[in-house]
C-alpha cells in the first residue's frame, strides 16, 4: 500500500514575456480546450504554454477587479475556482473570453501589431460558424495578414511520421476523442469518427466516483485535484474483464492500491499525569456513589408515599362498611372520587405500582448477588402477620402492611433462588449428558454441534435482516407486523355468558398459535433475542474450536461477520485496519478499482451511459472498409496522441486488441507521440515553414473578397462543408 499526498495546481511564477520576431515568421497557436500553446514557426518548442482559462477576480480589500489568464489564475486563492474556459466541450462558445486569451498571448509574445501569418489548430469537423467567427476576429480585430487552420491530431501525425505515411490517428483529447485514418499521406475524413469522451470527462467521472464512494468525506475534492489524480495514478488495463474481477483481492490490493492523503490538522491532546487520572477516576466513583445514595433515598420516599396512599385508600374502602350510602358517597367526593368503582381502580393502580417497585428492587438485588438469601425465622422476622387487625392500632396496622410487603419480597427471593438452583442442576445434567455423548460417540456429537451452529447462524442472520426491515415502514416485515397487530386488535372479547350457538375460543390449543406474538416483536425485543443467540453461538464455538479439528477460527461468527472481510470494506478501506480515532485515516481516500475503471470508458463508453462505440470498435469498422493491403498500411502506424493518450498501458491495450482482429502475422505498430501534449504544436510549427502552408493560408484580400467562411483545403485540415 502506497500513500501519496494529494497534489494541487501551484503558481510556478509569472508567465515570461518575449520579444517580437521578424514579420515573415509565422505565429503558431495550438488552441486547445485544456491548454493553449503559442510560439514561432520553425522552432522546436512553443514559447507559451498555459491553461486556457480566464478569471475575473475582485479584491475586496483594494476594491479592484483583475482579469487573470492562464496560469496567472493561480495567483489568488479564490480566482482559480471561478475561472472559465472559452470552450464548451471542444468548441469555442464564449468569444469575449477567447479575445482576452488572444490578447494575453500576443502581449506575452511582444506583438503590438499583428504582421505575422497565423497557423492555428482546430478540432476535427470544427463547425463552420466557429471557424468563420475566429477568422473574422483575427482579420477584423487583430489585422492578421493571413490565416491557415489544421486538425490538431493530424499535425501530431505529421510530426511523428514520415511524409506520405499511412496510419490511424487516435487523438484522445481533453473534451473529445477522434479516430482519423490516413492513407498515403491523405486523411480520410469520411471515415473519421468522434467519441464524446476525453480528459475533462474522465477527471469529472473520477470525482463523481469518489463522491459516491465517500459521501461523508470531511474535505471537498476539487476538480483540479481530480484531474491531477487521474493523470498521476490511473492506467489502462490490458485485460479489463480479468483485472476488474480481481481488483479487490487482498494480494492485488497490497500490490496496487494507492492511498491519497488529504491535508488535516490533528488536535493536540493534553496528556494527564497518573495522579490526575486517579483523581478524575475517584471523582467519578464518588459521583456515582452519591447518585446511587440519592436514588435510594428517592425510592424509599416514593415507597413510603405509596404505602401512605394505599393505607388512606384502604381506610376509605373500609368506611363503606360502617357509613351509610349517602355519607360514604360524600366521603368519596371529598377524596376526589366520583364513585366506588373509581376508588377501587385507584387502589389497584397503587398496588400495581408497589409491585413494580418491588420487582425492580428484586432485580437490582439479584444483579448485585443478593440471591444468596439467608434463611430466617418468618415468625420472628414478621411477628405482626399472624396478629388480627382488630388487635392493632393505626401504627400497628401500618407496620403490619409493611411487614406483609417485606414478607412477599422475601418469598420472591427464596423462589428465585430455588428456581436458579433447579436451572443450574438441569444445566449441569445437560452438560454431563453432552460430555458423555462426546466421549462415547464423537462423530454424532460433532455433527449435532455443527448442525446446531448452522441453525443458530441462520437464526441470527434472520434476526438481523428482520431488525433492519422493521426500520423501514414500507418493508414487507413492517407491513406484516402491522397486519398482525391489526388482527389481534380486531378480535372480539369473549362474553361472560355464552350463547348456545357460540363456539368456545380454542386459541392456544396449538403451538403454532403462539407464533403470532413473535411476528409482532419490536426492534428492542429482537436485540435481546440477538444477544441470547450470540451467547449460544460463542459457547458452541468454544467447544468446536477445542475438540473439532476441522472447525477453525475462520468458521467462527466473528470472522464470518467481520466487516474487514467484506467486499465493501476492501473497496473503501483496502487492506488497512481502519481506526475511527485516527485523524489521518479519516482524511484518506483509497484508489483501487478507479485506477482502471476511469480509462476504460474510452474503450466502452456504455460504462457511463454514452451510446457510442469505443475506439477499438471504430478502428475495426474503419479497417473493414479497406483491402487487406490497405489494412496492413493503416495498422503499421497507429499513433496515440492527446493528453488522455499519455496514460500508461494505452499502447499495450490497443496493440493487444488490434492483434485479435488482424490476420496472423500482421505487422502492427502502435506507438505514443513523442510528446502527446505538444506534438500538435510541433507538427504545426514544422508545417508552417513549408510551401504547403503558404498555399493553404487565406490572405486578408481573399477574406475581404470571399468572406469569413472561405478556407483552402489541404492534407492536414478540415474540408469546406
Curated annotation (Swiss-Prot):
Residues 486-507 are annotated as: Disordered. Keywords: Chromatin regulator, Coiled coil, DNA damage, Nucleus, Transcription, Transcription regulation. Gene3D superfamilies: 3.30.420.40, Actin, Chain A, domain 4. SMART domains: ACTIN (SM00268). The keyword Transcription applies. Belongs to the actin family. It holds the Pfam family Actin. Residues 266-368 form a coiled coil. Component of the INO80 chromatin remodeling complex. The keyword Cell division does not apply. GO terms for cellular component: cytoplasm; cytosol; Ino80 complex; nucleus. CDD domains: ASKHA_NBD_Arp5. This is Actin-like protein arp5. PANTHER family: ACTIN. GO terms for biological process: chromatin remodeling; DNA damage response; regulation of DNA-templated transcription; transcription initiation-coupled chromatin remodeling. It comes from the Eukaryota.
Amino acid at each position: 500500500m502506497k500513500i501519496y499526498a494529494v497534489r494541487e495546481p501551484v503558481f510556478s511564477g509569472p508567465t515570461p514575456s518575449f520579444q517580437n520576431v521578424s514579420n515573415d515568421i509565422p505565429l503558431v497557436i495550438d488552441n486547445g480546450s485544456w491548454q493553449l500553446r503559442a510560439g514561432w514557426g520553425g522552432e522546436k518548442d512553443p514559447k507559451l504554454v498555459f491553461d486556457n482559462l480566464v478569471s475575473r477576480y475582485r479584491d475586496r480589500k483594494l476594491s479592484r477587479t483583475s482579469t487573470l489568464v492562464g496560469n496567472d489564475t493561480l495567483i489568488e486563492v479564490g480566482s482559480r475556482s471561478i475561472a472559465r474556459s472559452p470552450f464548451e466541450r471542444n468548441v469555442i462558445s464564449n468569444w469575449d473570453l477567447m479575445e482576452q486569451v488572444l490578447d494575453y498571448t500576443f502581449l506575452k509574445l511582444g506583438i503590438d501589431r499583428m504582421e505575422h501569418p497565423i497557423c492555428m489548430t482546430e478540432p476535427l469537423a470544427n463547425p463552420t460558424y466557429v471557424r468563420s467567427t475566429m477568422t473574422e476576429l483575427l482579420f477584423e480585430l487583430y489585422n492578421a495578414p493571413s490565416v491557415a487552420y489544421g486538425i490538431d491530431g493530424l499535425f501530431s501525425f505529421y510530426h511523428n511520421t514520415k511524409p506520405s505515411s499511412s496510419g490511424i490517428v487516435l487523438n484522445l483529447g481533453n473534451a473529445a476523442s477522434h479516430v482519423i485514418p490516413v492513407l498515403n499521406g491523405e486523411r480520410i475524413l469520411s471515415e473519421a469518427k468522434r467519441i464524446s469522451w476525453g480528459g475533462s470527462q474522465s477527471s469529472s467521472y473520477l470525482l463523481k466516483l469518489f463522491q459516491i464512494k465517500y459521501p461523508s468525506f470531511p474535505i471537498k475534492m476539487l476538480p483540479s485535484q481530480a484531474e491531477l489524480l487521474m493523470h498521476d495514478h490511473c492506467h489502462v488495463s490490458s485485460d479489463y474483464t480479468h483485472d476488474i474481477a480481481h481488483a479487490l483481492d487482498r494480494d492485488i490490493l497490497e500490490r496496487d492500491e494507492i492511498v491519497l492523503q488529504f491535508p488535516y490538522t490533528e488536535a493536540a491532546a493534553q496528556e494527564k499525569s497518573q495522579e490526575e487520572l486517579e483523581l478524575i477516576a475517584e471523582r467519578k466513583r464518588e459521583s456515582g456513589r452519591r447518585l446511587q445514595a440519592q436514588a435510594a433515598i428517592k425510592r424509599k420516599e416514593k415507597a413510603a408515599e405509596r404505602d401512605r396512599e394505599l393505607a388512606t385508600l384502604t381506610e376509605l374502602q373500609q368506611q363503606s362498611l360502617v357509613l351509610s350510602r349517602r355519607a360514604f358517597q360524600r366521603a368519596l367526593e371529598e377524596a376526589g372520587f366520583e364513585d366506588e368503582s373509581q376508588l377501587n381502580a385507584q387502589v389497584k393502580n397503587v398496588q400495581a405500582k408497589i409491585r413494580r417497585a418491588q420487582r425492580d428492587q428484586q432485580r437490582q438485588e439479584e444483579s448485585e448477588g443478593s440471591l444468596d438469601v439467608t434463611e430466617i425465622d418468618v415468625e420472628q422476622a414478621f411477628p405482626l402477620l399472624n396478629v388480627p387487625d382488630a388487635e392493632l392500632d393505626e401504627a400497628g396496622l401500618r407496620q403490619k402492611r409493611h411487614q406483609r410487603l417485606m414478607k412477599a419480597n422475601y418469598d420472591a427471593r427464596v423462589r428465585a433462588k430455588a428456581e436458579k438452583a433447579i436451572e443450574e442442576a438441569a444445566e449441569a445434567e445437560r452438560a454431563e449428558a453432552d460430555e458423555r455423548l462426546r466421549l462415547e460417540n464423537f462423530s454424532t456429537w460433532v455433527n449435532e454441534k455443527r448442525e446446531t451452529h448452522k441453525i443458530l447462524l441462520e437464526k441470527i442472520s434472520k434476526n438481523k435482516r428482520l431488525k433492519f426491515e422493521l426500520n423501514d415502514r414500507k418493508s414487507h416485515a413492517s407491513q406484516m407486523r402491522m397486519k398482525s397487530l391489526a388482527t389481534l386488535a380486531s378480535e372480539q372479547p369473549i362474553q361472560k355468558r355464552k350463547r348456545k350457538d357460540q363456539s368456545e375460543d380454542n386459541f392456544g390449543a396449538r403451538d403454532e398459535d403462539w407464533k403470532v406474538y413473535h411476528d409482532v416483536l419490536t426492534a428492542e425485543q429482537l436485540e435481546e433475542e440477538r444477544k441470547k443467540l450470540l451467547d449460544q453461538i460463542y459457547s458452541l464455538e468454544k467447544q468446536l474450536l477445542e475438540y473439532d479439528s476441522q472447525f477453525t477460527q475462520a468458521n467462527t461468527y466473528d470472522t464470518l461477520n467481520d466487516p474487514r472481510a467484506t467486499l465493501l470494506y476492501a473497496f473503501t478501506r483496502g487492506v488497512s485496519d481502519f481506526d475511527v480515532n485516527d485523524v489521518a485515516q479519516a482524511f484518506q481516500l483509497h484508489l483501487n478499482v478507479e485506477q482502471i475503471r476511469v480509462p476504460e470508458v474510452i474503450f466502452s463508453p456504455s460504462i457511463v451511459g454514452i451510446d457510442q462505440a469505443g475506439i477499438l470498435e471504430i478502428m475495426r469498422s474503419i479497417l473493414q472498409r479497406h483491402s487487406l493491403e490497405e489494412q496492413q498500411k493503416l495498422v503499421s502506424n497507429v499513433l496515440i496522441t492527446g493528453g488522455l493518450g499519455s496514460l500508461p498501458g494505452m499502447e499495450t491495450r490497443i496493440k493487444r486488441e488490434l492483434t485479435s482482429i488482424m490476420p496472423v502475422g500482421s505487422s502492427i505498430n502502435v506507438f505514443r507521440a513523442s510528446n502527446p501534449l505538444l506534438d500538435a504544436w510541433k507538427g504545426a510549427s514544422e508545417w508552417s515553414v513549408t510551401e504547403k502552408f503558404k498555399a493553404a493560408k487565406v490572405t486578408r484580400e481573399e477574406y475581404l473578397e470571399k468572406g469569413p467562411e472561405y478556407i483552402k483545403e489541404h492534407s492536414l485540415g478540415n474540408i469546406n462543408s
